[in-house]
Amino acid sequence: MSIHQESLIAAPTQQVFELLTSGSLFSAATGMPAEITDREGDAFSVFGGRVEGRQIELVPGQRVVQAWRFGAAHPSPWEPGVYSTVRFALAPSDQGTRLVIDHTGIPAEWIEHISQGYPTFYQDPLTKFFSN
């Protein structure tokens, strides 16, 4: 199962990329603990460990690809070894950055929950962070 969502963020693509690959910036935007690096292969943890995974592909100013799962701190963590793949594609637009989220390999029972969560936990906080 998969999710596709798009939004506009009022910031250059490089700034959005930096936020998605920096624990301190991501935490500042979301208000929740985050451990993220800008190195491919590194593990990450966001939202206080509710979501965790690994940085698969990082292309500055263009895209972030992650192996993604609900972690041990989530009320309903995924089974060990179960991961989905999320791709955050960044494209320049007149308003700043078009953020395209493609999330694949999601267990069917989680599609609606995750789809509804992206605006709350990603798009809205990023939009607010860059509007200040």
Write out the residue ranges for each language-model feature.
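A conserved amphipathic terminal alpha-helix motif
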Residues: 105-132
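Residues that scaffold the ATP/ADP-binding catalytic core of kinase and kinase-like folds
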Residues: 19, 29, 67, 109, ...
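Hydrophobic-ligand binding "helix-grip"
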Residues: 27-31, 35-38, 45, 49-96, ...
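Hydrophobic ligand-binding cavity/cleft-lining segments
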Residues: 1-35
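Hydrophobic beta-strand positions in extracellular immunoglobulin-like domains
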Residues: 9, 103-105
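Short, conserved loop/turn and helix-capping segments at secondary-structure boundaries
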Residues: 20, 80-81, 115-116, 120
